[in-house]
Curated annotation (Swiss-Prot):
Residue numbers carrying Phosphoserine: 34
Superkingdom of source: Eukaryota
Compartment(s): Nucleus
Organism: Capra hircus (Goat)
Pro residues composition-biased segments: 305-322
Predominant subcellular localization, coarse grouping: nucleus
Assembly description: Interacts with ESR1. Interacts with UBE2I/UBC9. Interacts with SMAD3. Interacts with DDX20.
A GO molecular-function descriptor: DNA binding
Protein's UniProt name: Forkhead box protein L2
Protein function: Transcriptional regulator. Critical factor essential for ovary differentiation and maintenance, and repression of the genetic program for somatic testis determination. Prevents trans-differentiation of ovary to testis through transcriptional repression of the Sertoli cell-promoting gene SOX9. Has apoptotic activity in ovarian cells. Suppresses ESR1-mediated transcription of PTGS2/COX2 stimulated by tamoxifen. Activates SIRT1 transcription under cellular stress conditions. Activates transcription of OSR2. Is a transcriptional repressor of STAR.
SUPFAM superfamilies: Winged helix' DNA-binding domain
Chain's gene name: FOXL2
């Protein structure tokens, strides 16, 4: 038997077949980098467009500084800053009220921004804003994401807190604190005992002054009225001294000025009248009510009655001021006017409330108890 062997041409064809397959697969190798051609290689050269839905990673100070630096005159108005931020970052097209309020706050409170008034007076509204030359390099190498810590220049404190002036002003030599002037011991609010010194009562402060001492004549009148009140209390209400007590009430009270309530604090406790707040003797304790039908000295008459005419047989009318025969015989003749009637009238005229109390006490016998309690007030 003869063995059959394949022809060498077939073997060479079989050997060349895998090589052709490899050659066909080799052009596919550079295919993977081709999809990334648009995203990776040209990313650094083409400028990035910010995403409108994403907030820019810059502070409001950086946005303001960016807008001012990129302007032609290195200064912008508030509306110009708004327009630059909206054109640069579309994110700020919405919610304008919130971030624009923050821009205004940063312009006013940050020391890096200086307000420059417009030329030509107030013809156009709005001022220019520019950067302080001392804050030109507050961002490192133009990187607005990193801000350097700036050392703020020393600014003197306000006028009312300058060294050498107290919190309340004039101090050292006077020993107190005023509103104007300078002290020698620095800030006044650091020295607690200072405002307790005597000089604190200054004319510029609307504080009440201590009451002035009473006049000597008022003290004498008050003492005399107190003695008269004690005597009237011992003698009783029907004595002539009762009218003198009412007259004495008006004496010290009339001598007081508009600050009589303050001055009465300096009187002894027994001299202060607790009813009307004015100085004067206290009202005597009321005696027990008693029935009486005789007239008193305070019942004043216009004129004294003439003496009665002698009786005669003719039917003559009685003279004026005399009782008629039909009157009861038990009626007592009117008493003459007391010697102190003008003083009583003067006292009642000066203090109507005292006159009301006095007359109501004597005229109405049934209300004596209630009026006595009124006098004790």
């Amino acid at each position: 038997m003869m063995a059959s062997y394949p022809e060498p041409e077939d073997a060479s064809g079989a050997l060349l077949a895998p090589e052709t397959g490899r050659a066909a697969k080799e052009p596919e190798a550079p295919a993977p980098p081709s999809p990334g051609k648009g995203g990776g290689g040209g990313a650094g050269a083409a400028p990035e467009k910010p995403d409108p839905a994403q907030k820019p990673p810059y502070s409001y100070v950086a946005l303001i500084a960016m807008a001012i630096r990129e302007s032609a005159e290195k200064r912008l108005t508030l509306s110009g800053i708004y327009q630059y931020i909206i054109a640069k970052f579309p994110f700020y097209e919405k919610n304008k009220k919130g971030w624009q309020n923050s821009i205004r706050h940063n312009l006013s409170l940050n020391e890096c921004f200086i307000k420059v008034p417009r030329e030509g007076g107030g013809e156009r509204k709005g001022n220019y804003w520019t950067l302080d030359p001392a804050c030109e390099d507050m961002f490192e190498k133009g990187n607005y994401r990193r801000r350097r810590r700036m050392k703020r220049p020393f600014r003197p404190p306000p006028a009312h807190f300058q060294p050498g002036k107290g919190l309340f002003g004039a101090g050292g030599a006077a020993g107190g604190c005023g509103v104007a002037g300078a002290g020698a011991d620095g800030y006044g609010y650091l020295a607690p005992p200072k405002y307790l010194q005597s000089g604190f009562l200054n004319n510029s402060w609307p504080l009440p002054q201590p009451p002035s001492p009473m006049p000597y004549a008022s003290c004498q009148m008050a003492a005399a009225a107190a003695a008269a009140a004690a005597a009237a209390a011992a003698a009783g209400p029907g004595s002539p001294g009762a009218a003198a007590v009412v007259k004495g009430l008006a004496g010290p009270a009339a001598s007081y000025g508009p600050y009589s309530r303050v001055q009465s604090m300096a009187l002894p406790p027994g001299v202060v009248n607790s009813y009307n707040g004015l100085g004067g003797p206290p009202a005597a304790p009321p005696p027990p009510p008693h029935p009486h039908s005789h007239p008193h000295a305070h019942h004043l008459h216009a004129a004294a009655a003439p003496p009665p005419a002698p009786p005669h047989h003719g039917a003559a009318a009685p003279p004026p001021g005399q009782l008629s025969p039909a009157s009861p015989a038990t009626a007592a003749p009117p008493a003459p006017a007391p010697t102190n009637a003008p003083g009583l009238q003067f006292a009642c005229a000066r203090q109507p409330e005292l006159a009301m109390m006095h007359c109501s006490y004597w005229d109405h016998d049934s209300k004596t108890g209630a009026l006595h309690s009124r006098l004790d007030l």
